[in-house]
Amino acid sequence: MNKISETAKIGQDGFRFDRDDSGKLIEIPHEFGVKLGDDLRIGEFVTIDRGRWRDTVIGDNTKIDHHAHIAHNVIIGKSCLIHNFVSIEGSVEVGDFSQIFPHCNISPQVKIGKNSIIASNSFVKDDVGDFELWGGVPAHFIKKLNK
């Protein structure tokens, strides 16, 4: 059974604009949806945008803490922990059983491997492998985690 806060916003358009010939900003429609797994916990003021070119997906048994943002086209695997004030930008993929600790920013199109950990206050701009601990600004590899 999913526990989704009343203040969570799920399925709104993502933030994508292009300019026309005059320079005016034109909003780009997002035509895909959000697929939610089972046994989720989605906290207060979480936002999960629908996809632009694929569904945004939250895997089974994943827990998302208050004030987190999940952008369009993101895929989060099963049994992940996404802590408070995390921003996961467009088209990021997070592998099963991974954890992203508070106040992290994950740049667009980054891939985070399974069973990996992102330390608090990190800015991730590079792909993270399976079973890796990363942290810092910018985030860097710290160590391999036990399997």
Range-by-range predicted roles:
Residues 3-35, 40, 44-45, 49-60, ...:
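Glycine-rich hexapeptide-repeat left-handed beta-helix
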